Amino acid sequence: MELNNLKPAEGAKHAKRRVGRGIGSGLGKTAGRGHKGQKSRSGGFHKVGFEGGQMPLQRRLPKRGFTSLTKEFVGEVRLSDLEKLPVDEIDLLALKQAGLVGELIKSAKIIATGELKRKVVVKGLGATKGARAAIEAAGGSFAE
């Protein structure tokens, strides 16, 4: 057995359906599409979601929610990230310099994930109730 002699098993491959190539093929003239009507024409098919004139599902259901335009400008920082910062006074600029938030971020919020064991002073940043409690328990404070 050599690679150049390999062939698929007998009957494993089917010939491609050649439609519209004479009546002897069984698929001549109308090519299996029947007579007339939208489905027999080229390009003749309804759009996705079309329900025959009935009000389509995506228009029957109400609109919900919205996309916040400010979401991409607000950053989140974990307590465990603050633990790694070399500075004791933490503000937005310090977070940007450490690479914890992106350059386009305009405000940030500290969330209570991980733990903080050292004293830090947080300036101009928001914090969740749990994060605020953890920072104050570690001897830290908030300066607005």
Curated annotation (Swiss-Prot):
InterPro entries, A to Z: Ribosomal_uL15, Ribosomal_uL15/eL18, Ribosomal_uL15/eL18_sf, Ribosomal_uL15_bac-type, Ribosomal_uL15_CS
Cleavable signal peptide: none
Keyword annotations: Ribonucleoprotein, Ribosomal protein, RNA-binding, rRNA-binding
Record-linked SUPFAM superfamilies: Ribosomal proteins L15p and L18e (SSF52080)
Region of interest (Disordered), residue spans: 1-57
Compositional bias (Gly residues): 21-31
Gene3D superfamilies: 3.100.10.10
Described function: Binds to the 23S rRNA.
UniProt similarity note: Belongs to the universal ribosomal protein uL15 family.
NCBIfam families in UniProt: rplO_bact
Protein name per Swiss-Prot or TrEMBL: Large ribosomal subunit protein uL15
Organism in which the protein naturally occurs: Paraburkholderia xenovorans (strain LB400)
